[in-house]
Structures are given as structure tokens and as C-alpha cells.
Amino acid sequence: MNLLKALSIVSGMTLLSRILGFVRDLVIARIFGSGMQTDAFFVALTVPNLLRRLFAEGAFSQAFVPILGEYKTKSEVKNDLSETKILVDRTATLLAWALILVTLIGVIATPLVVFLTAPGFLSAENGSQKYELTVNLMKITFPYIFFISLVAMAGGILNTWKKFAIPAVTPTLLNISFISMSLLAAPYFDEPIYALAWAVFIGGVLQLALQIPALLKISMLPSINFNFFNPMNLYKLLKIAVQDEGVKRILWLMFPALLGVSVSQISLILNNIFASYLQNGSVSWLYFADRLMEFPAGLLGAALGTILLPSLSEYNAKGWKEKYSELLDWGLKLTFLLATPAALGLAILALPLISTLFFTGEFSQHSVYQTRLALWAYASGLPALILIKVLAPGFYAKQNIKTPVKIAILTLCITQILNVILVLLLNFQHMGLALSISLAAWINAGFLFFKLNQHKVYFNYSVAEWIKFLLKLLTALALMSASLFLLVGSDESWLQITQIQRAIKLFGVIIVGILVYFATLFVLGFRLKDFKRHV
């Protein structure tokens, strides 16, 4: 398989999802604006998303995909995938019942969860109303963890089989659910914000349903026992699953992985706690800025991580050390080639982007400026966040979870120290929260890179070749930045025209920036064929 082609497929599907995501955010901003209700909803969504990352896309995926890849490689040698299917069935059964338990506890304990994650809501203006609204919304959004965690497991299976398209397109269903519920259902709710909560629930159901045909096609649809009426039989099945050698290895890897992912998610929760004490709208400004930053991060970072982990796991199972290192080198160069212009573009075009997408309806000019501050801070850390997506799989594929965990713990401590300095001492407000994440991301990426070198995982690269590569890259970035600065003009020139005019103008500026960047790279000797890689 051509990895560049696979990256294009995943990025293309992700692009579709991101476009729908921006339409979703545009609709939410126009209908709901930024204020008490949106703050309540975004906090209500934070905890289910956090648990999703812990159980599925975080600790579980890091432990499950490398083991699954190893089983698949060995089974293919025997030409018998029965052992792999048993591993999938037993793992899915344990995951499903763990999710049921967590969901039930979460719904019951929602008042306490909201108090712990956003304590400032009680002391804010209209505090009691804001707190109660958040509690009610979270009771609806919490079951999303059950659906999306099983979706993430299905995605891990499909990606291991190099079936990247379905997992990549799956997020579009949640965005479609958001858009549909906002436009069609919100007017029929006494409090329209409840439409967004139900959109989360419905989206999770649709996403899970989409995985089933694809899993059936590769004969890997998990067989899960949901028989509540035969507890003894269920107990026996769960006991067998826990005693399975492959499942035990997954669980053993999950403990350090869970700690590592918990650290990063705790950092987000602590940021929410800081933000809950800031002025109304702070959580929303950070959210909208994060959505813009996540656009290139998803297109490149998530896509690279998706295609690298299964291939690296396969190389590790086969003992191909040099190919392993070469694949990491390929991922790092692509990251610098695509992430650095994206970061500069976000920073230079911050106000044009925000005003074009969100400056309408209840989203005020003040919100535009405040969101820009957050986006500037996030953009500075974008390359580092994507580098982490490339470097971390270098450890996960080798089933080494402890090293990234130690780095994550150190990063958490640094992030909170930066929060105190930037938010409390320097009074950077919500911008300080975003900046602390960016600075910590660079520190995280630096430590991961150092450890990969130290462990001789990433070793056969040319320093001279990298210096030459970076000098050419800096030249292209300088010319692109100059062209963007010349074309952007003043803030007023964007705020005083219609949204359609802003969109047309922004499209033209982006096209010119892209052409200048890639034309410069072409003149300097970069060719697409140089980045093609087969696995």
C-alpha cells in the first residue's frame, strides 16, 4: 500500500468531516452565540469526550492496536485468523461492559461531576441556573461514551486491516446530527440548547451503526454478549476474556497508557476549571479557537497517527528496525512540510478566518477579537501537537507505554505552572490557557524525540539532509508569510464587509498563499514522488 495515498484518503475524509464541523460551528455560533448556555453545553460535552479518549482513542487504542497488529501478522503466516477473531470478541465484550458500568455511574453522579469540572459555574452570574443546565445537558451527552468508544475500537480493527476510509468518514455523522438538530429541532425545545445535547446522543448511535457493514466485510464484527438475564453465563464469558493471554497483555499495557492519557486529559480539565472563573464566553472562545486549530491537526496529525501505528506495529512484529526508523523519518518530514505553513497561516489569517466563519448572529465583534487571541496561542503549538502524533506511535507500536507516560506527567506539571504564570500572574486570561498548552506541547515533542534517539528507535537519519530540508522549508515559509501579510490588510477591511464577501476574499488569499508556498518548494527541488512510500 502507498502510504501517501492512504494519507490522502484519510485526510480527504477528514477534510469532509472538518468542513461539516465548521458548518456545525457556524450554525451553533449563529443560533446560540457565545454565553451561559453554550458554556454549559461545552462543559457538558467535556467529560464524555474525556472518557472517550481515556477508554477508546487514548489508552485502549494504544494498547489494543499494537497487540491486534501482532496477532494479525502471526495469523496471516498461519493463514488462519481464528485466534485474532477470538481476541477481538473477548476484548470487545470486556470493553462494552466496562462502558455500560461507567455510563451508569456517570449519569447518576452528574451533579458531582459538573461541580468538580466547572466549580466556577456556581459562583458565576446566574450561577445556579448555569449549574443546573450543565447537569441536565450532561445526563444526555454522557451515554455518548458507550457508542463512540465501541466506534473507536471498530476503527482500530479496520485501520489494522488498512481499511482507513470508514473510520475517517465516521465523524461526519456527528456533525450532520449537530447541524440537523440545530436547524430543525432547536426551535421546538423550551430551551433550544437541549437540541445540541440530543444531537450528541443520536450522532453516537449513527456512528456505531456505520461500522457494522465494514466489520462484517472483513469477518471481524465483534461478538458481544449483552444477555442481562443470564448473569452466570455472562460471568463465565467475562472470566474467560480476562484470562485470555492477549487480553491480559492489552490490560497490562492499558494501565500505564491510562495514566498517560489521564494526565493529558486532566490538563484539559484543569484548564476548564481556570476558564470557569474567567469572564463569560471564555470557554466558548477557547472552543472556537480550538476548532480552527484542530482543522489542520486532524487533517495531518490524526491522519498520520492513523496510518503510522498499524504499519509500525507490523514492522515491529517482523523485526524490521531500519524500515521502522525510515517510516518515522518520513512522518516527521511530512509534519514539518505541512504543519508549519498551517500554523503560520492560522496566525496570520486568524481574524479573517474567525470573522468569516463565526461573525454573524449572536457572535459579536468582541468575541471575534477574543477568539483571535486564543487562536494565536494555539497556532504557536500546532506543529508540536502534530509531531506528538508521529513520535508517540514510535513507542506504542513497540508496546512501550511507560516512556510517553513519564513525559506526559512532566508535561502536566509544566502546563499547570505555566497556567499560574500566564493566567494568574501575567493576566493573559483565556489566551494564557491556550499558550500554556502550546508551550507544553513543544516540551512534550522534544522529550519524545530525544527518547526515540536514545533508545535507538529513530536512528538512521542524516543530519546534513535535515538541515538542507529545513533551510528550504524556511525559505518557502518566509515567502508565503510575506504574501499573506500583504494581502490580508487591516482588521476593519474584514469586519466591515458581508460574510459572503469575506469568504470570497479569504478563499483567494488562501489560494495565493498555498501557490506561493508550493511553487517555492518546487523551485527549491521538492517533488511529490520523493514522499511516496510503500508498506
Predicted segments with their positions:
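Membrane-embedded alpha-helical bundles of multi-pass transporters/translocases
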Residues: 1-535
